[in-house]
């Protein structure tokens, strides 16, 4: 078995090169042994990738061979698999789910996002599973029985239609780009039931992603949506990744970063008389933390959807946000990343404000210049050692180095300077260091960038 498929947050590989039916069956066998300790059943769904159903059958056969009953959720967005584990479906209560998805990765990728007893199965859990599988031998077997089909999609939609009934007849038309992922399957029926006017691009699930890559964190993938909004005079738009757990929001003159969405959501909670408690990640802007801290409370934590779900549960914060568009609501919801739910929460902003009001809220924040996220190629073996050496070097920085106010080491190195910060962290999923810099203006941000990268080069 190719050990490269065992990542920090999930299991992910290239079909059929590093992840195939044989490995899916073996993973099912050993994962089933772990899952049956808390429940004898599991919900399993898949996204639109062309190999999803092949992996579903092999994984399910492995799970069955370990004594688990498999419930077949079919073609669904990832949040629906989470919803099944947290809420139950049609009287079936089961805290385990597996979503077969390649998320926002290229079409040849696929993998497993695992929920065990309503918690993400990640990090040490995945590494322990890998160690077990390296010493195990399994002969692939067919399904013992056809998994029972369960309509989780309709149950999910009923839940959200009820929770967002106050959005009925929203006065704004919205534009949506689903990138040929599975998001439209979940969201469009909800919008129709609420009589919200919308116009969709690429709503048909197609695992070949013929129009553009389904990653809304890349500006180039938003071009079609921007053009569609301009041509049709639509003031607000949303884009989703392939499995609908990440969102991007656009208005006529602005693309909202994840930390800007966090500010808007926190301000609405505050306006409702709630003192918001918000968790951000190390890549979020200092402006976000400073702004929310004027009327609420923030906590900075590690990047990664599994990390933030666990921290949200621990702290009972209202919500958490990542720059990449993962938004996790605990207030009124279950605390997992759901881009379709986040879209509906964003539409609530329009009950009291116009799209231009939202733009003005962001424009009126203290100005800062932030560099794009950049990747530095390093070997998988060296990346964490490099970060460790950088942390040591910063304890005694060069004399010409900008004044350091604080060093935050929860995830890589975030160096807080007088007028901004510099971040260098090891990616948990790829052989790269990831960097990001912020300053009171472009000159300051680039000064911080030069200083940190020069120090990095000397290590």
PLM feature spans:
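Proline/glycine-rich low-complexity loops and linkers
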Residues: 78, 130-158, 162-164, 251-323, ...
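Gly/Ser/Thr-rich active-site loops/lids in small-molecule metabolic enzymes
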Residues: 122, 200-202, 254-274, 338-348
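N-terminal small/polar loop signature for handling phosphorylated ligands or for N-terminal nucleophile
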Residues: 41-109, 190-250
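Phosphate-binding and adjacent anionic-ligand microenvironments
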Residues: 274-436, 442-459
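Gly/Ser/Thr-enriched, mixed-charge loops and adjacent short helices
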Residues: 110-230
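An N-terminal, well-structured beta->alpha segment
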Residues: 1-61, 65-66, 91, 149-172
